[in-house]
A protein has these predicted regions:
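Alpha-amylase-like alpha-glycosidases and glucanotransferases acting on alpha-linked glucans and related
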Residues: 191-352, 378-631, 637-639, 653, ...
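Short amphipathic alpha-helices and their capping/turn segments at secondary-structure boundaries
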Residues: 131-134, 166-174, 359-364, 431-445, ...
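Long, contiguous interaction/targeting segments characteristic
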Residues: 1-50
Length: 693
């Protein structure tokens, strides 16, 4: 392929020919990378064989026009979502205005000529995402940002669960809190529970069954076999060990829960098939369709294959005949293991029932947001989703990030990207299904790496991340669908837009009503001064930190830098500069606290002489509570003065990511006078500044 033809093919496929590097300079993408990415993509030209694209999205109330390709006259028929049918004729090459008024939703336009017909999905969307009435009225709310697996309690089985979540909602509501923000609850790998990253899931449509509160499952309570197992010395010993462990022992917890739930499942099966629970479960299975069936089959097959240590990495490690859900061997297994599939479907039903109950409870407590979920940027290569739908995912590429100063070879996240051309060919149904699954039963959805709506850095298989390129996604269409589903499910949207984000996506997100994320550590002006509380944008959520960053105490004591040096994450000459930079950040933050009146005038003015104390902790929380952001998210780790991070980006085996528990139980946290005093300050401060921009 000649140079001009190669570049044009790359442009047609959405592959950027250059990008802005860490030095602010344009850097060209190599021809090798262009060819490699073109080879793994679906052909974007296939959609051009139809007179109209497979889908068209119209946002707001402007003109809704399409210009059909080809020649001559077509007959058209428009079937609205509500069942109304309209028809007429149009001429190729001339703008065709859709008959109106069309309500917001999903409609179907069919063109026909002779014996041929073509269909286009018409999506009519609002311009902006949903906003809860309380926030629309100018109220400022706060809540807790919780990694659910870290929660300790006197009742759980060694990992935070939906029972703990329910209690957390009660505790927060009593203290003026409005929501609990959660880590991704996506399905992981019950058969390989040690693969615990919530950001490398098996499916973004289904839940992680390890969060089921087994003690609250009726069939566990009513099963004689389950109760005998539960009361045995062996079970109680294993439970105590898992509960008292400093880190989450995923394998031990999952083994306990699966053993208990097998007993409960046997009891459920023996019950009257006409019971309300059986009808509810059957309806759930019908609604879940093939997606749920093959998620369940995948979990069952993976568990069966765990005995062979060479097959523990998911389907890529399985024999060739098992690497796709539609292969004959897999279909035969499914036919022979219907009961096993039903068991895993039942676990998904239990998880959904319990999570839904938490949402309902949050609403009865008067919370305007209640729960917010987190949507990971992708699924792992060896996931149930890629196994069941390999056409949608480009398995010979991976998502990552271009080189920066701390990562000269870039980042490879090991997540195969969705092909934007396949998404479009399917009328964006995979994206719609994913949003619906994650917006269900919650008041807000956080989208991790929200820049993925605009572009993703694709890395060809076998290459380092510096050999990648940006691939464009249909951002206007995706934002329109996001707004439509947001309104339908009454779920506001938060975009994780940290780091270097193109101004293009920043403006689009703001116009679409997507909330920005403002992390205290990053809110410094060019002169290094921290942004004043009143200058935070109202359309944002503020926080001190995130799961990828040091805790408040860890930041102040610079423990994250010491840990990074120990783990070999920083070049030797960078560590000293990082400590100097941190010292300057601390001084700038202390200056900001004094300027905002968050600290008494007589208190220490030099950061180098100040250790983290309860008074300083309260001052930082008071500063955050005073920000004009409509939402404020606080981490329990910071209430407790914890120093160790829950995740260290850039590590795999060097650090026990996703395993560090909170230092106190839920019961102890909310009986702690310091914690209650701090939360009282936060709640009062938020209520005192309700009016804003």
């Amino acid at each position: 392929m000649k140079q001009n033809a190669l570049d044009q093919a790359a442009r047609d496929a959405g592959i950027s020919l250059e990008y802005i590097n860490v030095n602010g300079e344009k850097e060209a993408i190599s021809d090798e990378t262009k060819r490699a990415l073109l080879a793994v993509m679906d052909d974007p030209q296939s959609a051009k064989k139809s007179p109209l694209p497979p889908v068209a999205v119209f946002s707001g109330s402007g003109k809704r026009q399409l210009t059909p390709q080809g020649s001559g006259v077509y007959s058209w028929q428009l079937q609205t979502e509500k069942g109304k049918s309209l028809s007429g004729e149009l001429t190729a090459g001339e703008p065709f205005t859709l008959p109106g008024p069309l309500t917001q939703g999903y409609h179907q336009l069919t063109l026909s000529k002779g014996k041929k017909s073509w269909q286009t999905r018409i999506i009519v969307a609002p311009r902006r995402c949903y906003l809860p009435p309380a926030l629309e009225a100018g109220e400022k709310r706060w809540g807790a940002l919780v990694q659910l697996y870290t929660v300790r309690s006197e009742q759980n089985w060694g990992i935070g669960d939906f029972g703990d979540l329910d209690q957390l909602l009660v505790h927060l509501a009593k203290r003026g809190g409005d929501f609990v923000g959660l880590n991704p609850l996506h399905a992981l790998y019950p058969a390989s529970a040690g693969f615990a990253s919530p950001y490398s899931p098996s499916s973004r449509r289904w839940l992680n069954v390890i969060y089921i509160d087994v003690s609250q499952v009726a069939d566990f309570q009513q099963s004689a076999a389950a109760q005998k197992w539960w009361k045995s010395a062996k079970t109680q010993k294993a439970l105590t060990k898992a509960r008292e462990a400093e880190r989450v022992d995923y394998e031990a917890v999952m083994a306990l829960k699966l053993a208990a739930l097998r007993h409960a499942w046997a009891h459920f099966q023996a019950r009257d098939s006409q019971s309300e629970e059986h009808h509810s479960w059957a309806a759930f299975v019908r609604e879940g369709g093939d997606s749920l069936r093959y998620q369940a089959a995948y979990d069952g097959i993976q568990l069966e294959r765990q005995a062979d240590k060479t097959q523990q990495g998911g389907w890529p490690a399985w024999p060739e005949a098992w690497r796709n859900s539609q292969l004959p061997e897999v279909q035969q297994w499914c036919e022979q293991h219907e009961e096993e599939i039903a068991f895993w479907q039942w676990l998904q039903w239990l998880a959904q029932q319990q999570f839904s109950a938490c949402w309902t409870h949050s609403q009865s407590l008067g919370m305007s947001v209640g729960l917010y979920r987190d949507l990971a940027v992708g699924v792992a290569e060896g996931s149930a989703e890629t196994w069941h739908d390999p056409e949608l995912y480009r398995l010979k590429a991976s998502v990552g990030a271009p080189p920066d100063r701390l990562g000269p070879l870039g980042q490879n996240w090991g997540l195969p990207p969705m092909d934007p051309h396949v998404m479009q060919a399917r009328g964006y149904q995979p994206f719609i299904d994913m949003l619906r699954a994650n917006m269900r039963d919650c008041g807000a959805l956080r989208i991790d790496h929200v820049m993925s709506l605009l572009r993703l850095w694709w890395v060809p298989a076998g290459e380092t991340a510096d050999k990648g390129a940006y691939v464009a996604y249909p951002v206007d269409n995706l934002l329109g669908i996001l707004a439509l589903e947001s309104h339908r499910l009454r779920c506001m949207v938060i975009g994780e837009d940290l780091g270097t984000v193109p101004q293009e996506i920043v403006s689009l997100l703001r116009k679409s009503g997507v909330f920005s994320w403002k992390v205290l550590w990053f809110e410094q002006e060019k002169d290094q001064r921290y942004r004043a509380p009143q200058d935070y944008p109202r359309q944002s959520i503020a926080s001190a930190s995130t799961h990828d960053l040091p805790t408040l105490t860890g930041f102040w004591e610079q423990g994250d830098l010491a840990l990074g040096e120990k783990l070999g994450l920083y070049p030797g000459d960078a560590v000293k500069a990082l400590h100097q930079q941190r010292a300057a950040q601390k001084q700038a933050l202390l200056d900001a606290l004094h300027q905002a009146g968050a600290l008494p005038a007589r208190s220490q003015k030099k950061a180098e002489k100040l250790t983290m104390t309860p008074a300083l902790n309260r001052a930082i929380h008071r500063f955050l509570a005073d920000t004009d952001s409509a939402l404020l998210g606080l981490q329990p780790e910071d209430w407790l003065g914890m120093t160790t991070p829950v995740n260290v980006p850039g590590t795999v085996d060097q650090y026990p990511n996703w395993r560090r528990k909170l230092s106190k139980t839920l019961e102890e946290i909310f009986a702690d006078k310091e914690v209650n005093a701090l939360l009282k300050v936060v709640s009062e401060q938020r209520q005192s500044g309700q009016k804003g921009k």
